[in-house]
Amino acid sequence: MNSYIKNHCYLCITQEKIMTLTYKYSTMDRLLSLHNILKENNVDRLRELIESDKDVINMYDSNRLLPLHIAIEHSDIEIVEMLLDNNAVINGGETIKTHPINIAMILAGGRMMLYNDNKPVKPSKRIRRLLTVNNTEKYTKIVKLLIKHGADLKMVCRSYVLDFYKGGSYCIKTGYAIGYSYFSTIPLCQILWEETKHPSLYYMRRITIKCAIRAVNIELVKHFISNNLLADTDTALEDYFLEAVKTNSPKMVKLFLDSGIDINSTICENSHTALYHAVEQENVTLVMLLLNHGADPDIGDIYSMLKYAIMSSKHGVKLFNILVKNGARIRCCNDILIEAICKRYYSIISYILSLPVNYLPISILCMCIYELRNLPITRKLLKKINDINVSCDACNMYPIHAAVSINTSRLTRLLINKGADVNVRNRYGKTPIHLACMYSKIGNIKVLIKNGANVNERDNYGITPLMICSREGKVSNMEYLLANGADVNQTDYDKNTALTYAIRNKSKECTRVLLEHGADMCFMNRFHTPITIHKTHDNPAVFLAVIYLYFSVINDSSIRNKQGFVRNMRFVNNHKETKSLKDEIENELSIMKDNVFYTGDKKISLYDVLILDKLDDLANTIKRIRRIDLKQIIIFRRFIKKHIKYMEKRNSAIESVLSIINEYTSKDHLSRWWLLSPEIHRVIVSNLSMEDLKTISGYY
């Protein structure tokens, strides 16, 4: 019996030890037990648990939270104090957000407020709102308790010094570019001011004030100002005023204005005033508020302030007019005028030109002409410039160059009437007609030629206006130049003609115009002709030139003796595309030779219609030629139709001349004209050239 009792007692003791060991080494059970105690707010059980297992108060649960976190959330001050007295980790937490002091601050109504000097941020994005509860007084007491036991305030109020930022263009007075603070309520700020009485901790006050200003927390900032809490922060009042202006909030700025701050004092390292920053931020309401409270717009960096006003994306004219109306004097008229021209603010430009400006550089006139293209403003500028035949220093460009570069001839006429030289050169040797051919339409070219511009002028590379038109593919400009004496075969310094540029540009129409006006296809530079200088693949201009080459040979057989013709034919025979075109041309010419008809004893073929020297003789047979079917003629159809049209015009001119002669001689009874038959009359008149016929008949 005694043995049984003894064994039973031993077994109970062993089980108790096993349970104790299991409890001791089962973390989950230990934390679960602690959590239940914390939820029940049972101080006695917590005291017993701490006495038996003190290590449990610094263990993380599955959510990576400490018991102190849970105690803070349940707002039991006695339990929090007990945990702290037993060396609970007060500055623990994997992230800044999970530090006990941060959790207590959030529950006490604190929200993280940000300021960022390095990057302009809208006020709505400077505040990160976090979860808060209604009853925050007890959490405020917990915050006091945590601070008393050594909680690190840097977790809830911190800034970062960015050395690279100090040399930037932003205006700051402190070296802090980024900061945040959870002290966003009056009770919490009272705690902060009590705990940061030493000057070495004033930076936390400064961070909190700046965060409150940037977050547009009107109530809190008003508390700071009314209780004179901005004084002991080791920062000038102007620095906080700068932060207030940066918020773009008139209400925030008005708090400082009502406190009696000097509105015209400099508030940044660059000696700018509050008005300057308000203009820079394009805030019309804030600008008006500052001006109504006595801000002087005529002190500090007036040029930059007016420049920012003009460059405003929305309120440029309005801001400029407000500043000028309130006394801002324009000292750098030329620079301000350039800014206004860039933004095309005509009212500002007119105002500046109405001022007594002593000197205007010619570059402003060029800029105004090119950017604005405004005739009235250009007239006003011309009144202030004595000599318009002066070039800009940078590019040696003259006002006439700017005028012809735009698609309006009004400004060109205005400058010419004021005495502009139409043949003046820029730094590249280009005259106004060069630029007109490059950028403008035919209107400016007409004005320049009418006023004596040289159509064959070369630039520094030997390029003529006709070559520019060929290169740019401007057919109408090219036709007008050719009609006014442009040399179709003039070369540049590399021995390239206008035809070379047209073929390089693959411009079929430009090539056709040049060839119709006598462009030489056999002219050679050092190695090439206009045809051989470019590859034939996918270039319709080369194919057209080959067709005209054959047409030229038909009308002038001496071309075959030129070296350029030999080079062209070698090129044609060496390429598949041009060789195929050559076969088609020769086949079509054969068909035209076989297509014949007779007029009396005279045999005429369709091939004869291609020969220019025979057109005058063939004019009498135009009715027969018109009946010929041209379906098989594809390559030379254009030439035949053109020549038929010429013969029709010649016939009409002959009929007109005969009518005039008959009418004139009918009044002279002694005239022997009527002794001749009408057929002989026609033969006599047919011997006249087309030019003579036009002169007599007035036919066009």
From Swiss-Prot:
Top-level taxon in the UniProt lineage: Viruses
Pfam families registered for this protein in UniProt: Ank_2, Ank_4, PRANC
Key words of the record: ANK repeat, Repeat
Residue stretches of each ANK repeat: 29-59, 63-92, 126-155, 204-233, 236-265, 270-299, 301-332, 395-424, 428-457, 461-490, 494-523
PROSITE patterns: ANK_REP_REGION, ANK_REPEAT
Record carries keyword ATP-binding: no
Protein name: Putative ankyrin repeat protein FPV018
